Amino acid sequence: MQIPSSLQSSLQGQNQKAELAGHLLSTLTTYKYPEHGPSVLEVVDIQKKFQHFQALTHINLDLKAGEFVSFLGPSGCGKTTLLRIIAGLEKPDYGKVIKKGTDITLLSAEKRHCGIVFQNYALFPNLNVEENIAFGLDKKKWDKAQRIQRVQQLLELIELPDIAKKYPNQLSGGQQQRVALARAIAPNPDILLLDEPLSALDAQVRLNLRQRIRSIQSQLNLPTIMVTHDQEEALSISDRVVVMNHGVIEQIDTPHNIYYKPQTQFVAKFIGTMNFLKANCAVPNQLDVLGFIPLNLEQQKLKTGQNYSMGFRPEVVELVDDFGSDKESLYLPIKVLSTEFLGAKRRLFCAIHIDGIEQAKHLLQIEIENTKFKSLQELMFIKVPNQLIHVFDQQGYALC
């Protein structure tokens, strides 16, 4: 795979920083290069520090035409700082922001032709909806007829055609956010930037509005970046997700791969739920889980004498009565401590059961169909197919 020259040149000398090598490797091996034409936006080796706090470290990513990308991560991971650098509201200490082949790193925000929607809407309280939406059009000197036509077109697009004369304090939170979205896209920006646009709304409004945002974005074929800490939000509407942690990119991938093929232990922990158990490699191609339960992984390059962490999702588990003998699955003895009714499914909280003793430090979550949940026994077993098990090395990087 050909690495873009701008990215290749900017990365020279990075390998000298040993403490960052792992994260750089993770970023580069999951970096998705454009397959069909040039990128709309490239972020090349961006770094940012606030006094003694390293906010961003060697950030590399791209945005394609019509693509919806989410920056996902916990508070303080650097996702909003990265968005602000792309928007021109912050300047990086090092690196470049390239839009349609032009270096815009030092270009002011108003000249970048990006629409921005903030968490707090930022509508002008003294202007009505029509005037709020038209604010950017007035600055670009649209004539009156064009402005009226564009505002009405956008009100139809956000499905609020009759509120043009209302003021922000007369609107619900969801309506205000839709007006903020209309204002951002009114001047036909090249890129739309969304900074946690739904976090101030209640759950049902968020669900409806995120689908509306995605629908509008798709209709306009508008390249979009959204910052969020909500996993479901990012996975449900994004073409790709950028998972960030402590100022670095852990993984850039499709929502499907982020969930089913996490490249680091952090991604596996942060996205959904995963059960982790310690394991070590005493003989080639085999892990001893908890020191005594064999797990055969013939296709994996395990190093004898090394410790590993293995994990599996709650929904891939099958509850069985006996310890199986097949080598294609991992069997674990468990005792069910409590359950939660989830409608069609039931969540079980279990402890590994060794020599008749519950191992409190080895607690597991599993999910099964409610119809398969009959009764609790003193000792039961779970079955996990080997191909659905994830193995991570001591540095937290995935082997499978």
Roles of regions detected by a PLM:
Residues 2-23, 28-29, 274, 286-400:
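Non-catalytic connector elements of ABC transporters
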Residues 68, 107-266:
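ABC ATPase nucleotide-binding domains
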Residues 87:
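Helix-to-loop junction immediately C-terminal to a conserved catalytic motif
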Residues 72-74:
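The feature captures the beta-strand-to-loop junction immediately N-terminal to the Walker
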Residues 80-83, 179:
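ABC ATPase nucleotide-binding domain helices that frame the ATP-binding cleft
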Residues 95-103:
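Conserved ABC transporter NBD signature motif
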